[in-house]
Structures are given as structure tokens and as C-alpha cells.
């Protein structure tokens, strides 16, 4: 499943994205973020991070630098 999602994201980046002018408000782009998130955290958590990021990518959000987290913050216990 992870491989399929990665292939779909790469397909979007290579074939669909070039047809439109750049419009992502973030660095790295949302598709690059999604690819890194799925590679690092897998389909469920990485996909969830990607969806949340895509939902923030709109004209009313300032955007900016927003990298994929280095560690899975959902697994940290509050002390």
C-alpha cells in the first residue's frame, strides 16, 4: 500500500503538477511534503500529515517553511 501511494504521489508530481503554475504556499511543496511523510511514517500517519498539510494550503494561510516532523509526535507521552 505504501509503494502504491508513493507511486501515485510521484505520478502527480511528474505528470499533473507541471501542467499548472506553481501555487503551493509552503516549502517544501505539499506534494514533496506528502512524499516525505509517507516515506518516513507510512500510509496512515504519513497520509494523515499530508492531508492536514494540504488542507492548510489555501490563500488565507500565510504558508512558509513547514518541514515533515523528524519524529512521530503522536507517540510522545505527556509528562
UniProtKB/Swiss-Prot annotation:
The keyword Glycosyltransferase does not apply. GO terms for cellular component: plasma membrane. It comes from the Bacteria. Keywords: Cell inner membrane, Cell membrane, Membrane. InterPro entries: Membr_insert_effic_factor_YidD (IPR002696). Its main location: membrane. It is found in: Cell inner membrane. It is a peripheral membrane protein. Could be involved in insertion of integral membrane proteins into the membrane. Belongs to the UPF0161 family. PANTHER family: MEMBRANE PROTEIN INSERTION EFFICIENCY FACTOR-RELATED. This is Putative membrane protein insertion efficiency factor. It comes from Rippkaea orientalis (strain PCC 8801 / RF-1).
Amino acid at each position: 500500500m505504501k509503494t502504491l501511494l508513493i507511486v501515485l504521489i510521484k505520478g502527480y508530481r511528474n505528470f499533473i503538477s507541471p501542467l499548472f503554475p506553481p501555487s503551493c504556499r509552503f516549502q517544501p511543496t505539499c506534494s514533496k511534503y506528502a512524499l516525505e511523510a509517507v516515506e518516513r511514517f507510512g500510509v496512515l500517519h504519513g497520509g494523515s500529515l499530508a492531508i492536514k498539510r494540504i488542507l492548510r494550503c489555501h490563500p488565507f494561510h500565510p504558508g512558509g517553511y513547514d518541514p515533515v516532523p523528524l519524529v512521530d509526535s503522536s507517540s510522545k507521552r505527556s509528562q
